[in-house]
């Protein structure tokens, strides 16, 4: 409750004049203690204004109005990405650490979680640098992963991702294999494999 004594700027407003009040709040956690997720969360605001109208012509009277607003809370949609030689569904080959002129393969794994709202038409995209080769192996094969060689772009068409994915049910995951052929200029460096 804001009263005129606490907000002198709103104590008296001339016709057409505006005032402003700011406040902060925190929402409840979207994940409950039992690990269930609050789906399609919203915050409903009802703001009630009350004041006295003072006019030389019309005298005084009470003016009241209410405004109701709803704020929809976005989903937390996160991607975790790893590149590994030893872990994942593929057997990798090549020297470790990598050596100039010899290809070393890695498994790139992506994992998606989604908190509180269903997401439609989700897509994850990444680019392979010129020194990284797409090998064409994807697991599971049912996931829609494609590679555009002209752009060096890997694309994962997830489509619909339900609320709670990765929190109340298993994360959505996919892995693909790449080959890295280091050059002399990369000796002693840690080259980026996927961006």
Language model region names:
Residues 1-195:
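Exported/extracytosolic protein signature
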């Amino acid at each position: 409750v804001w009263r005129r004594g606490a907000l002198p700027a709103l104590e008296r407003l001339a016709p057409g004049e505006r005032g402003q009040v700011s406040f902060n709040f925190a929402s409840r956690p979207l994940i409950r203690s039992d690990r269930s997720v609050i789906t399609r969360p919203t915050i409903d605001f009802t703001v009630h204004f009350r004041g006295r109208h003072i006019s030389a012509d019309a005298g005084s009277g009470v003016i009241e109005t209410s405004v109701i607003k709803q704020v929809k809370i976005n989903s937390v949609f996160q991607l975790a990405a790893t590149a590994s030689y030893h872990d994942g569904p593929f057997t990798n080959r090549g020297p470790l650490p990598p050596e100039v002129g010899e290809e070393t393969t890695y498994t790139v794994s992506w994992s998606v979680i989604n908190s509180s709202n269903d997401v439609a038409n989700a897509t994850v995209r990444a680019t392979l640098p010129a020194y990284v080769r797409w090998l064409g192996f994807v697991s599971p094969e049912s996931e829609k992963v494609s590679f555009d060689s002209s752009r060096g772009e890997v694309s994962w068409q997830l489509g619909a991702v339900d609320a709670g994915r990765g929190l109340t049910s298993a994360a959505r995951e996919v892995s693909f294999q790449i080959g890295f052929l280091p050059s002399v200029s990369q000796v002693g460096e840690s080259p980026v494999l996927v961006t």
